[in-house]
Amino acid sequence: MNQNNMRQHNENWMRDLPLFLKLKPLTHLFIPGSHQSFSDLLNKKLPIAIDVPKVLRFVDSPWTRKTIERWGRCQELNVTDQLRLGIRYFDVRVAFLPGECEQSLDIFLLHGLYGRPIKEVLDEMYTFIIDHPEEILILDINHFYNFNDELHRKFLGQLEHLFNGKFIPAPPSLSLNQVTVDFAQQHGFQLLLFYQQKLAEQFSFIWPSSYIASPWANTNNVQHLWQYTEHILTSRDQILPNGGFFVTQCILTPTWWNIVRHFKKSLRTVMAAKTTEQAVSWLKKNNVLLMPFLNIVIVDFVELFDFCTTVIQLNFQ
């Protein structure tokens, strides 16, 4: 199936679920997601980002930025194309750039280099949910740089204003078993927000970080990745004793030696494409011992190898 057909096929996949799946808690559906979701456009004109070790920021140069851009980009598709493809979970890190966005609060996305202002991405997400009123998105903002409490409050205010009335209320307002596709569609809720900072506990529309787990293998070895993944899946109930969303990260993490050794190449060509292909094969094996523990699955370069369709179809197994 080509990308255009996949986008058309999966664009409203939650709307098109049969009722028995719409009545299952979201924590027990198979949901495709993207790793470093908004790294498709990294800006080589801005300095090296704050999430990179200081030693590299000291040797900032056009050559260094080009190398980081090739290895920091984990997605090719922009947010709208990912949404049309069927992605419903987004993994996000943000930074405040003093001098760049102090007045407009254009908080930037980043992964090695700075990307777009997050306001642009949020506007695209808002447009999508208005045009697709039965789709539900999970936004997981999990890394913050150069933030203080005042900036957190301003940013949360921006989110609350933009998505007003669309947030799925967080526990204890609802129990996990109440949060289904059907429930969200009946009430017009379309966004489940994780904002992994303690201050977020003051806001009723933000889900606490205790309701999501995203274990990271932190390996550049594909055999170690699958060993870790299968082990950690069977530990889901211990990791989330009160239940919650579980993210399976089917990704490899390059070391600096990997990057130096292949500096003219990219994450996609050296590691990510092969890993996403293996992830799809692993999912298609449909291991009956592991499938009950799967929930959200994320990869790099989500357009490859029918990843989204493969995950969505697991709901019907």
Language model regions located:
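Intrinsically disordered, low-complexity coil segments
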Residues: 99-105, 151, 172-186, 202-203, ...
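Intrinsically disordered, low-complexity acidic segments that are enriched in bulky aromatics
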Residues: 110-169, 189, 297
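A Trp-anchored, charged/polar loop motif used as the substrate-binding/catalytic surface
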Residues: 72-77, 118-124, 165-185, 218-238, ...
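Aromatic-lined glycan-binding groove of carbohydrate-active enzymes
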Residues: 186-270
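A motif-centric signal for short, conserved binding hotspots located
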Residues: 93
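Long, acidic (Asp/Glu-rich), low-complexity accessory segments flanking structured domains
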Residues: 1-85, 89, 98-131, 136, ...
